[in-house]
Amino acid sequence: MHAFLTHMRAKPGKRDEVIRLTTGMLEQTQTEDGISIYVFSTAKDSPDDFYFYDLYESEEARTAHEATEKFKETMPALMQVADFVGVTALEPYGPMKITPPGS
């Protein structure tokens, strides 16, 4: 498993554009193999701060995701409307429970 937590901050007045771009990425991942979790969130106390949690079944799945046309189109556009704050590689452990929202 390969997991990452990415933090980005929308540039002033660009929050809606960040949401539009990332929502498009989320739709794309529904068709990709090897992505177990792909969650986008904002901070409750700072709605211009975005946190993206990705969990891939393998390094190959992550590499394949980053090679998609959608990823290659979205990332440069996203960097125009948001600042990259940081990314943390995570080491998942223990059992996972995933329940889709609204289930």
Question: Could you tell me what each predicted segment is?
Answer:
Residues F40-D45, E73-S103:
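Glycine-rich beta-strand-turn "strand-cap" elements at beta-sheet edges
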Residues R15-E17, D49, A61, T99:
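Intrinsically disordered, low-complexity acidic/polar segments
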Residues H2-E32, S36:
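N-terminal first-folded block
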Residues H2-M8, V39-E66:
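Short, well-ordered beta-strand segments in beta-rich or mixed alpha/beta enzyme
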Residues G24-S36, L55-A89:
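An amphipathic, aromatic/His-enriched active-site/gating alpha helix that lines ligand/cofactor pockets
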Residues L5-P12, R20, S41-S46, K70, ...:
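Short low-complexity stretches enriched in small and charged residues
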Residues D16, D33, D45-D49, D54, ...:
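Acidic-enriched, low-complexity/disordered segments with a strong bias for Aspartate over Glutamate
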